[in-house]
Amino acid sequence: MYYGFDMGGTKIELGVFDENLQRIWHKRVPTPCEDYPQLLQILRDLTEEADTYCGVQGSVGIGIPGLPNADDGTVFTANVPSAMGQPLQADLSRLIQREVRIDNDANCFALSEAWDPEFRTYPTVLGLILGTGVGGGLIVNGSIVSGRNHITGEFGHFRLPVDALDILGADIPRVPCGCGHRGCIENYISGRGFEWMYSHFYQHTLPATDIIAHYAAGEPKAVAHVERFMDVLAVCLGNLLTMLDPHLVVVGGGLSNFEKIYQELPKRLPAHLLRVARLPRIEKARYGDSGGVRGAAFLHLAEK
């Protein structure tokens, strides 16, 4: 049995998956904001409850919104203050008497998609999240590529490419990013960036859902905006594809529901790739909000 925890700032969700990778049980509880011992107790209680339900001890994986392991074995997760700077992996492993694995929630999303029965046939899978920010994960032969600092999937913090400046104008503001730099692509091609870009060019603020509705109705500003956005997205993704050369790209996050992405990217990407490059398959994520739990559960499976 495989147990996956998706640990966020407001809730902890546990999903239990059987040997056929089907979810058979799940539970949600509030996340304790400041109390680390309480957090450990909740995770222990949920694990033991799952053991009782399954009649066996399952493997345990946890996805967190942050960096899973610093050099000193602690986690960096500002959205879960009770775990910030704590040796969560070591402490919980000791409490439940089995190895616990922890990874970034975006990596868990990518792992979940890569272990889809159909997608599993692709050796290299790029999971790309276009949500409030931009992130994701790289999966090679069913396992996460983490890198030395566990930041391999922090795609949103690449700077705007030169070709994007040709589209947006050289005077486009280099928007300050939460990482401390300016001009990171997540400020332009995320859901938030989609809205910011519309506001910048038209001095009018609209939510993404309204912009997309206006686009569908043929409103000229919205049409021009979507065309511009798709061009910038193709430039940025083209750089990623040239560096990583995946067989499959799976798109998640709020903007993944904008079906125009899957129609337009295959048309626009070739201009930004090497001439010898073949386009990867580009698909919408299949597991939605359950992807984090599913991927966390498969952190052990990926090592088999």
Curated annotation (Swiss-Prot):
Zn(2+) binds at H157, C177, C179, C184. The keyword Nucleotide-binding applies. It catalyses: N-acetyl-D-glucosamine + ATP = N-acetyl-D-glucosamine 6-phosphate + ADP + H(+). The keyword ATP-binding applies. Keywords: ATP-binding, Carbohydrate metabolism, Kinase, Metal-binding, Nucleotide-binding, Transferase, Zinc. GO terms for molecular function: ATP binding; N-acetylglucosamine kinase activity; zinc ion binding. ATP binds at residues 4-11, 133-140. InterPro entries: ATPase_NBD (IPR043129), N-acetyl-D-glucosamine_kinase (IPR023505), ROK (IPR000600), ROK_cs (IPR049874). Catalyzes the phosphorylation of N-acetyl-D-glucosamine (GlcNAc) derived from cell-wall degradation, yielding GlcNAc-6-P. PANTHER family: N-ACETYL-D-GLUCOSAMINE KINASE (PTHR18964:SF162), ROK (REPRESSOR, ORF, KINASE) FAMILY (PTHR18964). This is N-acetyl-D-glucosamine kinase. It comes from Yersinia pseudotuberculosis serotype O:3 (strain YPIII). The lineage of its organism: Bacteria, Pseudomonadati, Pseudomonadota, Gammaproteobacteria, Enterobacterales. The gene is nagK.
